[in-house]
């Protein structure tokens, strides 16, 4: 049985997510106490479909369906690994790794292309509306605003359907694992030669009233330490997993 999210692109993404689950399970040591990889992947697939199907009819728009597909995949991978291995930190690490492996490639190239084309990224964002773009792209279950100054643009997320999904399913601590995917594009921006760096001083998932993404014009950004509340949060349990002796 294949995953059916009602969107062919997201169906393909689900296929690659499950493929990456299998690869990650096969990479782990034989003594990790896990069952056959194909069996666990089948359970993740079935769990994902059950969670998604239970919610899809009540969703307000197709964009919410995409959000719930992502979240259902992450939730199922986390819960099935945790149930089998009795290892919560390991389950967080597994779900986070597989999610990032699945999505980081397309984002990496899109952000790099944007930075190559645009000499003054903050100026570009000042003339454009990030809030309008994301509102159209993410749908009515999300709420966005923006703030602009001469040298900075701030994207504000006032309502997050991703976090609400995990709250509703009793796993609010999973949201920062999903949020950590934003580090992919944030780090690309921060390391690029263009005069722009990012900050994320607050998120809803870490107790803030909103998620704030700052895009700051900075010609002297080299060596500046990242400002990211999620990066700090993921250094603490339950997210911080013990080092895997089989890595490296």
Give the label of every model feature segment.
Residues 199-204:
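Short, solvent-exposed loop/turn elements at beta->coil junctions and helix N-caps
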Residues 176, 228-248:
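Short, cationic low-complexity segments
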Residues 69-75, 79-175:
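Amphipathic interaction/junction segments at domain boundaries or subunit interfaces
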Residues 151, 207-210:
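A short, glycine/Asx- and small/polar-enriched loop/turn
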Residues 1-81:
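N-terminal, charged low-complexity regulatory/assembly segments
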Residues 135-138, 189-196:
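Short secondary-structure junctions
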Residues 162-165, 219-224:
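Short, charged/polar, Gly/Pro-enriched secondary-structure boundary elements
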Residues 210-218:
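C-terminal edge-of-domain segments
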């Amino acid at each position: 049985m294949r995953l059916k999210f009602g969107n062919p692109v997201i169906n393909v993404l689900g296929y690659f997510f499950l493929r990456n689950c299998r690869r990650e399970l096969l990479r782990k040591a034989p003594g990790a106490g896990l069952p056959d990889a194909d069996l666990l992947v089948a359970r993740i697939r079935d769990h994902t479909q059950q969670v998604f199907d239970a919610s899809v009819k009540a969703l307000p728009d197709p964009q919410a369906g995409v959000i719930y597909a992502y979240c259902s995949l992450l939730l199922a991978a986390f819960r099935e690994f945790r149930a089998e291995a009795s290892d919560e930190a390991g389950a967080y690490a597994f779900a986070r790794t597989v999610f990032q492996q699945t999505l980081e490639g397309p984002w990496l190239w899109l952000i790099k292309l944007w930075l190559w084309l645009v000499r003054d990224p903050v100026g570009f964002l000042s003339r454009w509306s990030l809030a309008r773009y994301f509102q159209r792209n993410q749908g009515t279950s999300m709420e966005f605003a923006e703030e602009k100054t001469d040298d900075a643009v701030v994207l504000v997320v006032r309502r997050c359907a991703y976090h609400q999904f995990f709250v509703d399913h009793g796993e609010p601590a999973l949201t920062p694992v999903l949020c950590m995917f934003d580090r992919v594009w944030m780090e690309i921006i921060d390391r690029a030669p263009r005069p722009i760096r990012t900050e994320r001083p607050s998120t809803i998932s870490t107790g803030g009233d909103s998620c704030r993404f700052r895009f700051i014009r900075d010609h002297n950004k080299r060596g500046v330490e990242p400002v990211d509340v999620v990066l700090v949060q993921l250094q603490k349990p339950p997210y911080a997993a013990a080092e895997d002796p089989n890595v490296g």
